[in-house]
Amino acid sequence: MSLPAETDMEDTKPSVVMVDNGDQAQFRFAEFSKNELALDEKSCKEAMDLFGETKHLLVANVLSMGNGTTEEAERNWFAFILYSIKKLAQKNEEIQKDEIENTGLTLCRILRAAKLNIAEFFKELPQFVVKAGPILSNLYGPDWENKLEAKEMHANTIHLKILSKYYKRVFEEFFVSTDANVENNSSVTNRVSEYHRFGWLLFLALRVHAFSRFKDLVTCTNGLISILAILIIHVPARFRSFNIHDSSRFVKKSANGVDLLASLCNLYNTSEDELRKTIEQANNLVADILKKKPCLASECETENLENFDRDGLTYFKDLMEESSLPSSLSVLENDYDHMTRNNGELDERLFINEDDSLLASGSLSRGSVSAGGVKRKIDLMTSPTKMITSPLSPHRSPASHANGIPSSATPMIAATPVSTAMTTAKWLRTVISPLPSKPSQELERFLTSCDKDITSDVIRRAQIILQAIFPSSPLGDRCVTGSLQSANLMDNIWAEQRRLEALKLYYRVLATMCRAEAQILGNNLTSLLTNERFHRCMLACSAELVLATHKTVTMLFPAVLERTGITAFDLSKVIESFIRYEESLPRELRRHLNSLEERLLESLVWEKGSSMYNSLAVARPALSVEINRLGLLAEPMRSLDEIAMDINFSCGGLPPVPSLPKPEPMSAQNGDPRSPKRPCTEHRNVLAERNSFTSPVKDRLLHLSNLKSKLLPPPLQSAFASPTKPNPGGGGETCAETGISVFFSKIVKLGAVRISGMVERLQLSQQIRENVYCLFQRILNQWTSLFFNRHIDQIILCCFYGVAKISQLNLTFREIIYNYRKQPQCKPEVFRSVFVDWSSARRNGSCKQRTGQEHIDIISFYNEVFIPSVKPLLVEIGPGGATTRNDRIPEANNKNDGHLAQCPGSPRISPFPSLPDMSPKKVSATHNVYVSPLRSSKMDALISHSSKSYYACVGESTHAYQSPSKDLTAINNRLNGNRKVRGPLNFDDVDVGLVSDSMVANSLYLQNGSSASSSGAPLKSEQPDS
């Protein structure tokens, strides 16, 4: 039997190579900077210096960028270099104001000159960040990534695209595009377009002046609704598409007429208090920037205000008049130019123009649980008919429209990023905000019943940690000359509101947890409630849910980890508890927590500095040498005093996501040991089942474990015990060993789901699936170091190719990558950038004589690192291998260098788990079911090849000579029929005959010819009960 051959590079990539060592590209970049962008001499020198430092990376990665051509790779690299020097060079040193104003280099200018669109730029930017990171760090300091703001820019761009579409939809719901009374509608269309543009520019002014730092999706939506209210009362009535007398949209009325703001809040799930504050700020902008005189609407007589309740409304008499509209547009344009001239970001005005080349087709979300959670393809898999049915929402949603047409009979609306965010924000507003901002009496009883009263400690910790996550800055700190002085005040109000929401949620869930733990341990919860890590994890989780609700741009996960001093492995210990103990948590937030756990398991816990390595070094001592050599151990957790000092020091101006200094060794506090080694868990079997509640892949993994123990769950405090402490559950294990076993079981389950998805896409046999899964498990247990600093999908992809080669399948790496791109969790950097430490690779059999660390493509990783390490395992899996003969890991294979290291009595390699199918959606009998055609582009993502036969698509008949409408009618008749499916059998009816077992057996015998059983076993009739 032959070993798996190394893959040929030419069958996986285009045969295009760089014809020089980068010198010609450097010359072309110089010409591009001078001729296309007209850079000044200083900026041009900075750009050329950075290009010179990174040109070797361009040469090495041409084939992995875009379509693999030199031209496209260069255009992307040029844009990355220029964007970097714009964002980093100016922040790295003090530059005179006149020098800044002369640069005029914006991302839009860069992209247009490079002939790239926004989607292309953000698709390839992460690869540049990974490859050029060390160089950028040397040139611009260790916090270069925070200064670059690439993730924030990406999330902001996604939000703007969503908001522009949302604004267009709501605008068209209230205003017509043509006038039926005018023969030539071209001028009318232009006028409406100007009103539409005016609203967007006023919204951007609101973002710049009032929402300065925290441009979250919920706040921006409130801003758009406030702009809509201004347009409704100012745009001439002849352009309205609604009739205020019969429109179902204006449901809030008083004796004085329609309450406009209350009706809009009811329509779009916004807070009336927040909307009134925002519209007041918008009115101030109109007065200050456009120099319009505000008037009380109650004192104005105009057609636009008829039948509206005018109390609390402000009116500007000539705001939308034909004579003043062009000048108002010009003033708003100039104000935006002045306020955003030097930030180097995108020109947000372009989002109003869908035909702009920069908005060319392409997904801004990079195929995963994307930035800020805006686009989650996995949600479509778990809920193809995802609808908003929150019990907090009114019984009838007046915002239910089809193609902009109001429908009072439709109780649900299809979920969009904006509607989902607003519904989730309503939960915070109505369920969490009314709670007290201090521990409840019940929680106080638990806190005071500890060995000492820790109430003041809990309150102080919460204040410090939440201040670190939601920092405030002094009034006027971020105000620019000529801007309104309300921006910073708005930031502080926003931060204070978010702190309160997170604090109240923390106290609420903590009280519920204590109540549940007390049932297991009694009332003495000292060990849990005095654990510093536990409380920080709870606060971080509370804050993350608040951030996820508001869809913030400037504090993207894992910002909460950095600011609280915990690691991804720490946070994973409380995710399940939040889902379990906060029963009112909206579905979207449950999914968010599940998606976080997926991210933690797939890559974050494997990164350098993860506390998982501290537990792994205790559980698997043979791996400690490699862990220490690579410097993977987590630093001790920072003290509260250190965090508090950082807050005070940073009050003069806090960057969006500051990098916390490396922790220094600290003494133990609150029972938390000085050692950073991760806490672990007890009661191994029960906890494995309990932890599976928060599955890695949202709802699909909620039932992965077949263990349904009836025992009480283990106490939560055991999850935060010292790693070296013996496991009270017995078996001679330490808590670290138990915790790592539970962690590995989660990794295996996540791997099983992803392997199954790839097998479906590639249409491979079940035997291949079993072999890939078996290899993945063996690598995790015997060659754990292959996962260090890597993404688990990188190992899975290599497993597929290795098994394909050993099984002599005609499957190329190109095919594997092509199908992986269609997976919901796909990120291009997974197969483009794999971490390699060459000293480790040489010890594992690599023939490369390189030194140091770098990131290479996955094919090079397969050839140089993966195959030399796992050849023995592949031989066992191949035909005639030892896997089928012995499924216990041989202890004789253990080495002292940390590889093939396994504890005595290693677990058996389990067969592929039984993954549950997608459960059907439960629909209330009082609601209709709405269906729409499924586009072919989405069908591939939702339905695998082997399961397409299970689905009936709208437009295809399920019976001969039937139309789709008749099929749907038949379905409705069955759902709504009054026939009882279940009921008692009537044995009293004289016409009912009893059928004996022998009669059934004889019938089956006759139908099958000679045997009633396919297996040849005789039928055994049951004897009647006596």
UniProtKB/Swiss-Prot annotation:
Compartment(s) of residence: Nucleus
Main localization of the protein described in the UniProt heading: nucleus
InterPro entries, sorted: Cyclin-like_sf (IPR036915), RB_A (IPR002720), RB_B (IPR002719), RB_fam (IPR028309), RB_N (IPR024599)
Annotated Gene3D superfamilies: 1.10.472.140, Cyclin-like
Keyword entries, A-Z: Cell cycle, Nucleus, Repressor, Transcription, Transcription regulation
Region annotated Disordered, chain positions: 656-680, 1007-1026
Domain B: annotated segments: 738-872
Pfam families: DUF3452 (PF11934), RB_A (PF01858), RB_B (PF01857)
GO biological process, any: negative regulation of G1/S transition of mitotic cell cycle
Region (Pocket): 416-872
Example of a GO MF term: RNA polymerase II transcription regulatory region sequence-specific DNA binding
Lipid metabolism as UniProt keyword: no
Gene Ontology CC entries for this record: chromatin; nucleus; transcription regulator complex
Spacer, as annotated region: 617-737
Record bears the keyword Chloroplast: no
Region (Domain A): 416-616
Function field: Regulator of biological processes that recruits a histone deacetylase to control gene transcription. May play a role in the entry into mitosis, negatively regulating the cell proliferation. Formation of stable complexes with geminiviridae replication-associated proteins may create a cellular environment which favors viral DNA replication.
Protein family according to the UniProt entry: Belongs to the retinoblastoma protein (RB) family.
Protein name, as recorded: Retinoblastoma-related protein 1
Gene this protein is translated from: RBR1
